[in-house]
Amino acid sequence: MEEEHEEESHLSQSDTVGSAIVEDGPGKEYEIYIKNEELVDKLKLLNYEDGFLKLGVVYKPILKHYFVKSKNVGEQFFLFTSLAAWLIKKSGDESYNMPQEFDDPNSTLANIMAAAKNKGIATDFTAAKLKSGAGENVIFILNSLADASLVHVGFQWQKMIPPKEEDEDTAVDEQDEDDDNDDIVEEPMNFLDDDDDDNVIEIDLKAQGLATESKNPLQSVLQSNTDAITWKQEVERVAPQLKITLKQDAKDWRLHLEQMNSMHKNVEQKVGNVGPYLDNMSKDIAKALERIASREKSLNSQLASMMSKFRRATDTRAELREKYKAASVGVSSRTETLDRISDDIEQLKQQIEEQGAKSSDGAPLVKIKQAVSKLEEELQTMNVQIGVFEQSILNTYLRDHFNFSANLLNIM
C-alpha cells in the first residue's frame, strides 16, 4: 500500500510538472484547437445533429476548428449565440428563447452571460469579448454549457481501461511461435466455419496415478507418469488435425499480389502502346521549341535598333517628366501668390466702392433737413403753448388781485 501511495504521489507530481510545461511550452497556442475538438465531441454526445441542426436550415454542422479563429464574424456570432441558447435549453432552462438574426447583440450576449452565471460558470471577461463569435472565451462558454447539459441529461464518463502490457519474454515467445507457424502448410481457401467448433482437438494422455496427482499436483509436475507408447499414439492421432487455416484479410499483401501483377502487366502494355506517341510528341515539342528560339533570335536582331530608340525615347521622356515636375512646383507656388494678391485687390475694391457710395450719397443731408424742420415745428408748437400758459396765469393773477381789492373795500 505504501508503494502504491508513493507511485500515485509520483504520478501526480509528474502530471503537475507536465501541465506546467504544457502551459508554458510552445504548444500553448494549439490548446484552443484541442478545446474546440472536445466541444464538437460533446455536441455529438448530446446528439446535436438531430436536436440543433434540425431547428432550421440556417444552422450548419460545426467543424472541429470552427470557433478557433474569426473569419466570418456575422455568421460565427449568430451560430455561437444560437448554439449557446440551445445548450442552455438542453441544460434544463426550457423557458430560454432562441435568439433571432436581427436581435440586439448586446442584449443577447447579456442574456447568455446571465444564464451561464446562474449555472455556476465563472467568467473573468466581459460580454464584449464574445462579439467576434470566435476565440478562447467563446469556446470556454460553449464547453461549460455543454458540460452542464451532459450533467443534466445524466451522461457519465466511463473510466478508461489501459491495455495490458506484455512482457518482453512473452513477446519473444509469440515471435518464435509465428516463425514456427510459417513452416506449417497454409490452406487459405479452406476456412473454418462456426460449426467446426465441434471438432475440438482433445488430447487425452492416459497416465497412472491420477488420484495421486489430484492429491499432490506439484509432485506430478516434477515426475511424469505418461507412458511413451501412449504419448506416441496420441501424437499420431492428433497430428493430421494440426493444420492452421488463416482467415482472409483485406489488408494482407498476398491477396493483392495477383492483382498487382495484372495491373503491372497492363501498365507495361499501355506504356508500350503509348510510348511511341509520347516519343513523337516530345520530338515535335522539341522541334517547336527550336523554331520558337530561332524566331526569337531573329526578332531580337531585327528589333535591336528599334529597341535602342525606344530606350532613348523612354529616357528622354523621363527627363522631360522630371523637368515638368520641377516647373510645376514653381507654377503652383506662383499661382498661390497670384490668388492671394487677387484676393487683396478684391478687398481693396470693395472698400473703395463702399467709401465712394458713402461720400456721393445725399441721404444724410436730407435726413438732417427733415430733422431740423421737425424741430422748428415742435418749437412753434411749444411757443404757442407757452403763450397760452402765460395768458392763463395772467388772467388768474388779475382775477385774484381784483377779488382782493374788492374785499378790502368792503371791509373799510
From Swiss-Prot:
InterPro entries hit by this protein: Intra-flagellar_transport_57 (IPR019530)
Keyword rRNA-binding included in the entry's annotation: no
Species annotation: Caenorhabditis elegans
Per the record, the gene is che-13
Q: Which family does it belong to?
A: Belongs to the IFT57 family.
Xref: Pfam families? IFT57
Q: Which GO terms describe its biological process?
A: chemosensory behavior; cilium assembly; intraciliary anterograde transport; intraciliary retrograde transport; intraciliary transport; non-motile cilium assembly; protein localization
Q: Does the keyword Coiled coil apply?
A: yes
Example GO CC term: the record gives:
intraciliary transport particle B
User: What upregulates it?
Assistant: Regulated by the RFX-type transcription factor daf-19.
- Map out region (Disordered) in residue numbers: 1-21, 162-193
Q: Where in the cell is it found?
A: Cytoplasm, Cytoskeleton, Cilium axoneme
Q: What is this protein called?
A: Intraflagellar transport protein che-13
